[in-house]
Amino acid sequence: MKHSVNRPPTPDEDDVADGFEKDKVTLREIINVKLVESGEKENLMELVRDRLVECGWKDEMRIACREHVKKKGRKDVTVDELIRVITPKGRASVPDSVKAELLNRIQNFIVSAAL
């Protein structure tokens, strides 16, 4: 910010761009609102949960959590730390078939909702 005695501060270009971005509604936000309003988001969440259980992903994450706790010691691990350590592994290990099915369902929703 550039300051002056006689006038309010002039925002830098970065500040103007940040303000503009905050006011702009993204396509992702619009789709999310439509998914929630229609109840489809809950259906998609249930689909993902079911598919992850079917493929054994949930069991893998449970094992990874237990191994981390065993390695660090039960009293020395916090939930926040466990989430921080396991989340990247979990996201990376979601099967491509689950991602593809979810993407397909979202695309079909967008087409049917005519967004």
From Swiss-Prot:
InterPro entries: TF_ENY2 (IPR018783), TF_EnY2_sf (IPR038212). The keyword DNA-binding does not apply. This is Transcription and mRNA export factor ENY2. Its main location: nucleus. Component of a deubiquitination module (DUB module) formed by ENY2, SGF11, and UBP22 in Arabidopsis. Interacts directly with SGF11, but not with UBP22. Interacts with MOS4. It comes from the Eukaryota. Component of a deubiquitination module (DUB module) that specifically deubiquinates monoubiquinated histone H2B (H2Bub). Does not seem to be a component of the TREX-2 complex. Seems to act independently of the SAGA multiprotein complex. The DUB module is responsible for the major H2Bub deubiquitinase activity in Arabidopsis. Expressed in roots, cotyledons, leaves and upper part of sepals. It is found in: Nucleus, Nucleoplasm. Belongs to the ENY2 family. GO terms for biological process: chromatin organization; mRNA export from nucleus; protein transport; transcription elongation by RNA polymerase II. GO terms for molecular function: transcription coactivator activity. One of its GO terms (cellular component) is SAGA complex. Keywords: Activator, Chromatin regulator, mRNA transport, Nucleus, Protein transport, Transcription, Transcription regulation, Translocation, Transport, Ubl conjugation pathway.
